[in-house]
Regions:
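Short, contiguous hydrophobic alpha-helices characteristic of membrane insertion segments
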Residues: 1-2, 10-11, 52-60, 134-138
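Sensory modules in modular signal-transduction proteins
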Residues: 2-30, 34-39
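Sensory/regulatory domains in signal-transduction proteins
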Residues: 37-127
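Juxtadomain coupling helices with adjacent low-complexity linkers
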Residues: 4, 8, 119-139
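Generic signal for short, ordered secondary-structure residues
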Residues: 1, 7-8, 17, 32, ...
Length: 139
């Protein structure tokens, strides 16, 4: 693996610096980690660590997530992607949220768990309402 030379502190810093929120469950469906604890869109208490994700996942989308995880475990799916509109501020204005799930597998293809990630595209919403000139060299 190309990350073998990284120490634990560096790996943790890298995970926190990712421009997405990440949650990981293991092969037994237990929540084993997440990043960006203080600033998450989908906040969760620390007591969620070690819980079966079914106990702490929003009921509205649980059936779909169960289907995705079951398909990942059976090997018929490796990823899933969808968008939702979600109010993220007190003003109630909805923002586009990209949600993706990725099967975690070892080099033999054995299912190790699932990584879910989500990202808000608030900055894209502002581009719709403003005329923005490209100031970047590589636009």
């Amino acid at each position: 693996m190309l990350f073998d030379r990284m120490n634990e502190r560096m790996v943790q810093a890298m995970i926190e610096a990712l421009p997405v929120e990440v949650t990981v469950i293991d092969a037994n469906d237990e929540v084993v980690g997440w990043n960006k604890h203080e600033e998450r869109l989908f906040k969760r208490p620390l007591t969620s660590m070690g819980m079966n994700f079914r106990e702490c996942h929003p009921k509205e989308s649980l059936d779909k997530v169960l289907q995705i995880v079951d398909e990942m475990k059976s090997g018929t799916r490796d990823k899933a992607r969808f968008w939702i509109d979600l109010p993220v501020n007190a003003d109630g204005k909805k923002h586009k949220i990209l949600i993706e799930f990725f099967a975690l597998r070892d080099h033999d293809g054995t299912y190790l768990g699932c990584m879910g990630q989500h990202k808000t595209f608030r900055i894209l919403e502002s581009f719709r309402t403003k005329s923005v000139l490209c100031r970047w060299k590589y636009c």
